[in-house]
From Swiss-Prot:
Gene Ontology biological process terms, A to Z: queuosine biosynthetic process; tRNA wobble guanine modification; tRNA-guanine transglycosylation
Function: Catalyzes the base-exchange of a guanine (G) residue with the queuine precursor 7-aminomethyl-7-deazaguanine (PreQ1) at position 34 (anticodon wobble position) in tRNAs with GU(N) anticodons (tRNA-Asp, -Asn, -His and -Tyr). Catalysis occurs through a double-displacement mechanism. The nucleophile active site attacks the C1' of nucleotide 34 to detach the guanine base from the RNA, forming a covalent enzyme-RNA intermediate. The proton acceptor active site deprotonates the incoming PreQ1, allowing a nucleophilic attack on the C1' of the ribose to form the product.
Matching Pfam families: TGT
Subunit structure: Homodimer. Within each dimer, one monomer is responsible for RNA recognition and catalysis, while the other monomer binds to the replacement base PreQ1.
Pathway linked to the protein: tRNA modification; tRNA-queuosine biosynthesis
Residues binding Zn(2+), per UniProt: 307, 309, 312, 338
Descriptive protein name: Queuine tRNA-ribosyltransferase
Catalytic site positions: 95 (proton acceptor), 269 (nucleophile)
Keywords annotated in UniProt: Glycosyltransferase, Metal-binding, Queuosine biosynthesis, Transferase, tRNA processing, Zinc
EC number(s) per entry: 2.4.2.29
UniProt keyword Metal-binding present: yes
GO cellular component terms, semicolon-separated: cytosol
UniProt-recorded Gene Ontology molecular function terms: metal ion binding; tRNA-guanosine(34) queuine transglycosylase activity
Length: 380
């Protein structure tokens, strides 16, 4: 059987061990480490596919749970799959819906068969199983699909986490058996286990034995301190095959992207750039800027003097502040564009630093300019 997803390792950074690679998908090949913008409902909020392409986005994310509810996976399938439905001819990854089931629904009951929960839109009772999650993702037609896993809260006890990862491993095997399009879609397994090294080892061992074409590290960026996330990555990524892509789910702050790459991660995704953009917060080479603040009312400089994105080439902080203060959609478009561009370009810089065997030096320079080295530094 030919796998639709292939990872090609190009170089390892001598200074850090970070990996430069190429992710080959049915819709193109893309350099890693990469940041994947999130388009929950088959759109990256306020941005067009053409804009994402001009930024250099390669793979984008869509959400199985949300698309199952609206418009329905049957409608997307009828349209010719997600690529045709949203006019995107590059890579797409869909998550399994597990995270939303565990985070959005107040009522839920976990059983061996699957999860019973309430629709967060109207309160209807719903059921999602490994088989159903894969069926929906087969219909959506993304290049990379994810196994259905349990997403335990942080913190969780060792006993609970052990039961959880063992269930997730059984569910992963059921996902593989249910997968109807293995020659067109790569199904990734998700390693869980919280902060417990022994459980991460057990989870990784179970999943690697099933020989997925790629692996995600799940259960991080759920409220734990950054030091815990980095420590977990340090003992988890070496457990995963070197010839398969490694995906850190739900992580998008600049410091975590760099620290994740240093610990062997190839793929990242997060709603962060568009979510904070809608609130008027932007990431710049000199740190975060809350554009609504009064100090920018007469600031006629670009958001980031070192950025060449469409927003920074054409508009000032004062103008963007005015738009955001007046709830103008164009303001949100401009901040979202800049933030997504910023993270895509950051990963270009990370890849170049790996080529030059100087990623640790780059990290130190970036952290110093951004302000991550200051006491009580913000997360983004």
């Amino acid at each position: 059987m030919t796998t639709p997803i292939r990872f090609e390792l190009i170089k390892t950074c001598r200074q850090t061990g970070a990996r430069l690679g190429i992710l080959h998908t049915p819709h193109g090949s893309f350099e890693t480490p990469m940041f994947m913008p999130v388009g929950t409902l088959a759109t990256v909020k306020t941005l067009s596919p053409e804009e994402l392409k001009e930024m250099g986005a390669g793979v984008i994310l869509s959400n199985t749970y949300h698309l199952w509810l609206r418009p329905g996976h049957d409608i997307v399938e009828e349209a010719g799959g997600l690529h045709a439905f949203m006019n995107w001819d590059r890579g797409i990854l869909t998550d399994s819906g597990g995270f939303q089931v565990f985070s959005l629904s107040e009522f839920r009951r976990i059983e061996e068969e699957g999860v019973y929960f309430r629709n967060h839109l109207n309160g209807d009772k719903l059921f999602l199983s490994p088989e159903k999650a894969v069926e929906i993702q087969n219909a959506l037609g993304a290049d990379i699909i994810m196994a259905f896993d349990e997403c335990p809260p942080y913190p969780a006890t060792y006993e609970y986490m052990k039961q959880s990862i063992e269930r997730t491993s059984r569910w992963a095997e059921r996902c593989l058996k249910a997968h109807r399009r293995p020659n067109e879609q790569g199904l990734f397994g998700i390693v869980q286990g919280g902060e417990y090294e022994e459980l991460r080892r057990q989870s990784a061992r179970d999943l690697v034995s099933l020989d997925f074409p790629g692996y995600a590290v799940g259960g991080l960026s759920v409220g734990e301190p950054k030091e815990v996330m980095n420590r977990v990555l340090e003992f988890t990524t070496p457990l995963l095959p070197a010839d398969k892509p490694r995906y850190l789910m739900g992580v998008g702050s600049p410091d975590s992207l760099i620290d994740g790459a240093i610990r062997g991660i190839d793929m990242f995704d997060c709603v962060l750039p568009t979510r904070i953009g809608r609130n008027g917060t932007v990431m710049t080479s000199e740190g975060r800027v809350v554009i609504k603040n009064a100090q920018y009312a007469r600031d006629f400089s670009p958001l980031d003097p070192n950025c060449d994105c469409y927003t920074c080439r054409n508009y000032t902080r004062a103008y963007i502040r005015h738009l955001i203060k007046c709830d103008e959609t164009f303001g949100i478009r401009l901040t979202s564009y800049h933030n997504v561009y910023f993270l895509i370009k950051l990963m270009e810089q990370v890849r170049q630093a790996i080529r030059e065997d100087r990623l640790a030096d780059f990290r130190e320079e970036f952290f110093e300019c951004y302000g991550f080295n200051k006491p009580n530094a913000k997360n983004f």
